[in-house]
């Protein structure tokens, strides 16, 4: 199976982990194995890599790609289960690329792309509710909230209203059917700079896969799963994710919270983390090779104190 995916911020991410040859590393979103392969090549026989992905197609590709790597463990699961996967082990480095893979976008039948007509699916794991289920069963208020909050779409109200109106006549089953509804819901001037469906498709994909609801607690678990001196590196692709990661990382670095007028600290809080990479974006060279890296941001944090 071909699982074409160009890893973004490749060197920046791998270098951010400060890889130790004998260390334990986790790729929470291994995909086609680009970042994972670079890590595995830097490990000794004593080192170990755990490559996790929720997509069964990715898992099959990873099994083939790492068949000759006895120290690479392939796990079909979601990153919010990292504590159970590690089962008490502590990692020297953990990475997560939160974007949809190129394979998922370019495989029409997965239903992620608004550029190809296909069944409305958008499931990363091929399990649970699909995009069609969301579009055809959620109330107008629920759709409005999702499109507004997860897509930051200014025309969310009219899009939600038209979705509900159109589905009364016929079930909305394909990506292009949804695109047509979105286009009729906004003025022409709103379609000049980018595809009109981009924000709504993002919102529905986030809802289908529970991306943001799982992320906040998963970041806590990832950080807790590090050894002291271990590094967590996360790549985000939209502002909602990036703000969440930035805020969570800041909380790990927070020290004393006593009022300024207190002569001495009584709360006992000291920083648990130290920021090592602060929102690095793709270079001009990478953008020319891979335009999809435009919105990618890398943030890294080193654990300096145990929980």
Language-model regions: role of each:
Residues 1-307:
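S-adenosyl-L-methionine-dependent methyltransferase catalytic core, i.e., the SAM/SAH-binding region
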